[in-house]
Curated annotation (Swiss-Prot):
Protein's name in the database: Enolase
EC numbers, comma separated: 4.2.1.11
Basic and acidic residues: bias regions: 52-64
Subcellular location, principal: cytoplasm
Keyword Lyase: yes
Residues noted as binding Mg(2+) in the record, renumbered to the chain: 248, 289, 316
One Pfam family recorded for the sequence: Enolase_N
Keyword Metal-binding listed: yes
Record's cofactor remark: Binds a second Mg(2+) ion via substrate during catalysis.
């Protein structure tokens, strides 16, 4: 949204704060001449694709085990501020391009994608504040009225938990709800029942994973799906028609020497594809993320041929919110959806460009958090603004996850009768 009257950026600041894992991250603040301002906090991933934009860390072992972000903070105040202060906050592309040009690298390793993204998002928030409208309305205009179906990560494995489950996330999606408020209640009720089931069977040895899901001691990935079905039914819901399943396999994490190592064995790509097809035939799985290694393009073609017409196949490590990687996927006919993580690409403008590219080629988009999160709720507004119809922001506990859900509840209330829950208009996961 542009205004004829410019909103001149007067001052940019940044500071080192903590994320949900107790690790440092960056918070950026953009203040306009009018006094309006925006603050944004940048998330961080545990399972990261090798093609992601560069997250700048200090590398000083005496501070935060080398994970400090004081370099990124200094880059905001010393290198970004001089090229952005004086620009119009309403011209998001100009602000982002100024930072990209100042960085001068393909992956933002000079300034750090975390430094650039903080300023990019804070600029949009300041612009929205200048107009005294919500961020979702500023970014999406009058059509920003679609509430996303949540992918609720209730069982954690892989890199997100210390247990013997290979797949990284097992999720529930309340596709049959009438409203987002109802969907959230359904998810919370299933999550509560799931906890009881796991405790009764003495399958819990600790608390929850990075994203708020349980990290139980299970014998296989299939056991996780069985327990989810049981929890859904015990909570009084119908698996599939009311609450569907989704998985983030994060296959790059257990790909070694051309083989996929899971369930205690080593398997060929075709065997792994067949295994996933078997799971889809046995369970109401509507979405699979990162089902194969991020560079195993030939196998991705096979997976898409096998499951692409019946299941949403999401590229995360495969595409890393990058329009170049997405375009390659489109050209090769690989996957049919993309996970959108702001810090994988590093600016709001490039994120919106990637979503637009996906939409033009009938690829679905899923707005996503990271495993290291903050109380920042930008992705909730972004999901509504872009009408993508899906959001992935963790489980039904841990306040950095719940903050996004609560923001969506407030947005739904603000929209009133104009609010539409995505599955009601066919904007949930693509599946048959």
């Amino acid at each position: 949204m542009l205004s004829k009257v410019p909103a001149t950026i007067e001052e940019i600041a940044a500071r080192e704060i903590l994320d949900s894992r107790g690790r440092p991250t960056i918070e950026a603040e953009v203040r306009l001449e009018s006094g309006a301002h925006g603050i944004a906090q940048v998330p961080s991933g545990a399972s990261t694709g090798s093609f992601e934009a560069h997250e700048l860390r200090d590398g000083d072992p005496k501070r935060y085990d080398g994970k400090g972000v004081e370099k990124a903070v200094r880059n905001v105040t010393e290198k970004i501020a001089p090229v952005v202060e004086g620009l119009d906050a309403f011209d998001q592309m100009a602000v982002d391009q100024a930072m990209i040009d100042r960085d001068g690298t393909d992956n933002k390793k000079e300034l750090g994608a975390n430094a650039i993204l903080g300023v990019s998002l804070a600029t949009a928030k300041a612009a929205a504040a200048e107009l005294a409208i919500p961020l979702y309305r500023y970014l999406g205009g009058p059509l920003a009225n679609v509430l996303p179906v949540p992918m609720m990560n209730v069982i954690n494995g892989g890199a997100h938990a210390d247990n013997n489950v290979d797949f990284q996330e097992f999720m529930i999606m309340p596709v049959g709800a009438e409203t987002f408020k109802e969907a959230l209640r359904w998810g919370a009720e299933v999550f509560a029942v799931l906890g009881k089931v796991l405790k009764e069977r003495k399958l819990l040895s600790g608390g929850v994973g990075d994203e708020g899901g349980y990290a139980p001691n299970l014998t296989s990935n299939q056991q996780a799906l069985d327990i989810l079905i049981e929890a859904i039914e015990q909570a009084g819901y119908k698996p599939g028609s009311q609450i569907a399943l989704a998985m983030d396999i994060a296959a790059s994490e257990f790909f070694k020497n051309g083989q996929y190592e899971y369930d205690g064995g080593s398997h060929s790509p075709q065997e792994f594809i067949d295994y996933q097809a078997k799971l889809v035939s046995q369970y109401p799985i509507v979405s699979i993320e990162d089902g194969l290694h991020e560079d195993d393009w030939e196998s991705w073609k096979g997976l898409t041929t096998s499951l692409g017409t019946k299941t949403q196949l999401v590229g995360d490590d495969l595409m890393v919110t990058n329009p170049v990687r997405l375009q390659k996927s489109i050209d090769l006919g690989v996957a049919n959806a993309i996970l959108i993580k702001l810090n994988q690409i590093g600016t709001l403008s490039e994120t919106l460009e990637t979503i637009s590219l996906a939409t033009r080629h009938s690829y679905r988009s899923v707005i996503s958090h990271r495993s290291g999160e903050t109380e920042d709720t930008t992705i909730a507004d972004l999901a509504v603004a872009t009408r993508v119809g899906q959001i992935k922001t963790g489980s039904l506990c841990r306040s950095e996850r719940v903050a996004k859900y609560n923001r969506l509840l407030r947005i739904e209330d603000e929209l009133g009768d104009r609010a539409v829950y995505a599955p009601k208009i066919g904007l949930g996961p693509k599946h048959s």
